Amino acid sequence: MNFSINRIVLLDNLSKAAKVIDYKNVNPSLSGIYLNVLNDQVNVITTSGILSFKSILNNQNSDLEVKQEGKVLLKPKYVLEMLRRLDDEFVVFSMVEDNELIIKTNNSDFSIGVLNSEDYPLIGFREKGIEFNLNPKEVKKTIYQVFVSMNENNKKLILTGLNLKLNNNQAIFSTTDSFRISQKILEIQSDNNEDIDITIPFKTALELPKLLDNAENLKIIIVEGYITFIIDNVIFQSNLIDGKFPNVQIAFPTKFETIITVKQKSILKVLSRFDLVADDGLPAIVNIKVNEDKIEFKSFISEVGKYEEDFDDFVIEGNKSLSISFNTRFLIDAIKTLSEDRIELKLINSTKPIVINNVYDEHLKQVILPTFLSN
């Protein structure tokens, strides 16, 4: 095996591949990065068993020149560290026998031990199924916006994931931890007439946005039990979570008694002063009391004290008398996902959830259940 390649491009692809690896896996070969060197391309492959990654490097995207085909199973840590420290534009990878990798530049070379490439499993990447295209920037933004309602440690496995529904030329992304719901709708153009309802694992939702940085194209392929993301020269595949995701749509009220319009930055500043965690680790709870022309924010944190603040920079429609309490951090996280200057806080009464969205765009909605305080 012998090839020359652009160092920065190789480092970028190896770094992305390494993030998929589960270093706790009992199979030692899965802790490596598998390079399959062909006549005109190098395939960079990793897998955790649930997630699988493959990038295709060639002369066009990485100045690749292959002198000898072959394969190698790299130990990521030392190879990545050395590639970061080198200054050369190009590096040459070659093998000595079957257990030693040589990395050369114009002024340096070093050798490093490798794993047995014959032990690496054959990874099947599924590239045929129900297909549709999305804007990678929009998907990246969407995942960050709905990620706030995900909880990797939820006892219900299905609630640890990100639900994706396709119907009526809409892609609906939903998450919930039972206390809050995040939902974002993207418009799509697809020839598919089949409704889709799948749930993507937490780890997949965590890693996918990192692969979408500077991406130009994103194709999504859904086949039974799997979802594949084709991102320019990268194929990112994931198992799906079995089970039925709850119908969160029924939690979205359609009629409200109180609608408060407020500047996003203004209310975030106020709420930040109530976001203090007590010594016992319990989350801060803020009581919001609407009283005609002002909103009273109140909080009492054991071993910290009581804090109150009046707020009048808002416009209100409907019922102007209401008292309701929420987890302060939940409110802050939800409001931060909204991108417009003015947002709406929609309420029914003190026992029903709040719905938060941008004033002029309801494609993103955040729902939070109230917290009930004992006297």
Swiss-Prot record:
Gene3D superfamilies assigned: 3.70.10.10, DNA Polymerase III, subunit A, domain 2
Give any single GO term for biological process. Answer: DNA strand elongation involved in DNA replication
Gene Ontology CC annotations of this record:
cytoplasm; DNA polymerase III complex
Q: Name one GO molecular function term.
A: DNA-directed DNA polymerase activity
Chief place where the protein resides: cytoplasm
| Keyword DNA-binding set for record | yes
Report the InterPro entries cross-referenced here. Answer: DNA_clamp_sf, DNA_polIII_beta, DNA_polIII_beta_C, DNA_polIII_beta_cen, DNA_polIII_beta_N
Q: Which UniProt keywords are present, listed alphabetically?
A: Cytoplasm, DNA replication, DNA-binding, DNA-directed DNA polymerase, Nucleotidyltransferase, Transferase
Q: Is the Thylakoid keyword given for this protein? A: no
Known partners and oligomeric status: Forms a ring-shaped head-to-tail homodimer around DNA which binds and tethers DNA polymerases and other proteins to the DNA. The DNA replisome complex has a single clamp-loading complex (3 tau and 1 each of delta, delta', psi and chi subunits) which binds 3 Pol III cores (1 core on the leading strand and 2 on the lagging strand) each with a beta sliding clamp dimer. Additional proteins in the replisome are other copies of gamma, psi and chi, Ssb, DNA helicase and RNA primase.
State what this protein does.
Answer: Confers DNA tethering and processivity to DNA polymerases and other proteins. Acts as a clamp, forming a ring around DNA (a reaction catalyzed by the clamp-loading complex) which diffuses in an ATP-independent manner freely and bidirectionally along dsDNA. Initially characterized for its ability to contact the catalytic subunit of DNA polymerase III (Pol III), a complex, multichain enzyme responsible for most of the replicative synthesis in bacteria; Pol III exhibits 3'-5' exonuclease proofreading activity.
Query: What family does this belong to?
Result: Belongs to the beta sliding clamp family.
Write down the NCBIfam families for this protein, in alphabetical order: dnan, PRK05643.3-2
**By what name is this protein known?**
Beta sliding clamp
